[in-house]
Swiss-Prot record:
This is UDP-N-acetylglucosamine 1-carboxyvinyltransferase. Pfam families: EPSP_synthase. Gene3D superfamilies: Enolpyruvate transferase domain. Phosphoenolpyruvate binds at K22, N23. Belongs to the EPSP synthase family. MurA subfamily. The lineage of its organism: Bacteria, Pseudomonadati, Pseudomonadota, Gammaproteobacteria, Alteromonadales. The active site is at C116. The keyword Cell membrane does not apply. CDD domains: UdpNAET. It comes from the Bacteria. GO terms for molecular function: UDP-N-acetylglucosamine 1-carboxyvinyltransferase activity. It comes from Shewanella amazonensis (strain ATCC BAA-1098 / SB2B). Pathway: Cell wall biogenesis; peptidoglycan biosynthesis. Cell wall formation. Adds enolpyruvyl to UDP-N-acetylglucosamine.
Length: 418
């Protein structure tokens, strides 16, 4: 099994090109099922989860071709409506096939999902919303079995809690429903906006995009389109934090500053000079050690949970004491014991991590426990004396495209080893 070997070096410096957003690409790939003509997606990152999504679509009978960052989907021959356990167990986003299959074909059997081990992430919001639209659903033998006679019906859905995945599933289902669907307390994440914009390009009628109330007037058919996936804001944030921790200066190209305002504000609080353009972000620490910051995760536009682990590392090496409070997922501090093995001074109190900054960490063999935690360990290794060996990096490969190559391009000593 591959590992990453990391050695400390100087400050990161240079330019990194940001990949397309995994969390936008996955739902948009599933939306290809809704199209009655070929659908072309560009700026798609080369990731394990993307490959799994393509396998799932092929398993249903769709024709999928991958050419670099371009994926073409022809769903006209879909004749199979089961998303099997073998594929779904490795990727939570597989649940997003449920809405499109049910809306277009009236039937879907989807295995209960797997993916990152960071808490329950219940699917009941997805199921309850689809039931309000007329679906008959039972969970049996590890599968969600959903059926509808004719088309789904428009409904007024109030979501008990903000859920990105449930918003996306219901948005896709409503696009082909009969009548008007209103989703209240909808997620406002940029990736939800990207999916909605893609659906509009396919012929969907959606208003309120980017707000907490989405109104979808169902249409009888959706067509394929050419669509470019938004830049990955979490990858962007990860490289910016790595540069801040190493007291460096970097430029992120193919980035979207408007999707990262809460993160950029915290980096400025930490002492970084930030400059932005339409599609680039520059960070310069001027050789200074970052200052500790206080973080509280919450749904967009507040601070993203997917950047929490990276800021834990920033605080580990910062001047002063900072607190990180996690409000989205339980069990999302699994990186803390690994960082403590490297010499971090941290303590957990419920959903809050109190971090006292130290000058340097010590290299150690550590284990990645989930996608973003593994990125935090790589950043820690860049400021640790000796060698850091990160095990279980298949988590990293699920969400970061060629991460070691990109770090090497910035001067980081990060090497993949067997």
């Amino acid at each position: 099994m591959d590992k990453l070997s990391i050695q400390s070096g100087g400050p990161l410096a240079g330019t990194v090109v940001i990949s397309g957003a995994k969390n936008a690409a996955l739902p948009i790939l599933m939306a290809g099922v809704l199209a009655e003509s070929p659908f072309v997606l560009t700026n798609v990152p080369s990731l394990r989860d993307v490959d799994t999504s393509c396998k799932l679509l092929r398993c249903l009978g769709a024709e999928v071709t991958q050419d670099g960052d371009r994926i073409t989907i022809d769903s006209s021959r879909i004749d199979h409506f089961v998303a099997p356990y073998e594929l779904v167990k490795t990727m939570r986003a597989s649940i997003l096939i449920l809405g499109p299959l049910l809306a277009r074909f009236g039937t879907a059997d989807v295995s209960l999902p797997g993916g990152c081990a960071i808490g329950a992430r219940p699917v009941n919001l997805h199921l309850h919303g689809l039931e309000q639209m007329g679906a008959k659903i039972e969970v049996k033998e590890g599968y969600i079995k959903a059926r509808v006679d004719g088309r789904l019906k428009g409904a007024h859905i109030f979501m008990d809690m903000v859920s990105v995945g449930a918003t996306e599933n219901l948005l896709m289902a409503a696009a082909l429903a009969d009548g008007v669907t209103v989703i209240e307390n909808a997620a406002r994440e940029p990736e939800v906006i990207d999916l909605a914009n893609c659906l509009v390009a396919m012929g969907a009628q959606i208003s309120g995009i980017g707000t907490a109330t989405l109104k979808i007037t169902g249409v009888e058919r959706l067509n394929g389109c050419d669509y470019r996936v938004m830049p990955d804001r979490i990858e962007t944030g990860t490289f910016l934090v790595a540069a801040a921790v190493t007291r460096g200066r970097i430029r992120c190209e193919n980035a979207d500053p408007s999707s990262l305002e809460s993160v950029l504000a915290k980096l400025e609080d930490a002492g970084a000079e930030i400059n932005t353009g339409d599609d680039w972000i520059e960070l310069d620490m001027h050789g200074k050690r970052p200052k500790a910051v206080n973080i509280k995760t919450a749904p967009y536009p507040a601070f993203p949970t997917d950047m929490q682990a990276q800021f834990c590392v920033l605080n580990c090496l910062a001047e002063g004491t900072g607190t990180i409070t996690e409000t989205i997922f339980e069990n999302r501090f699994m990186h803390v014991p690994e960082l403590m093995r490297m010499g971090a001074n941290m303590e957990l109190e419920g959903h809050t991590c109190i971090v006292h900054g130290v000058e340097r960490l010590s290299g150690a063999q550590v284990m990645a426990t989930d996608l973003r935690a593994s990125a935090s360990l790589v950043i820690a290794g860049l400021m640790a004396d000796g060698t850091t060996l990160v095990d279980r990096i298949y988590h990293l490969d699920r969400g970061y495209e060629h991460i070691e190559t990109k770090f090497e391009g910035l001067g980081g000593k990060v090497v993949r080893v067997k």
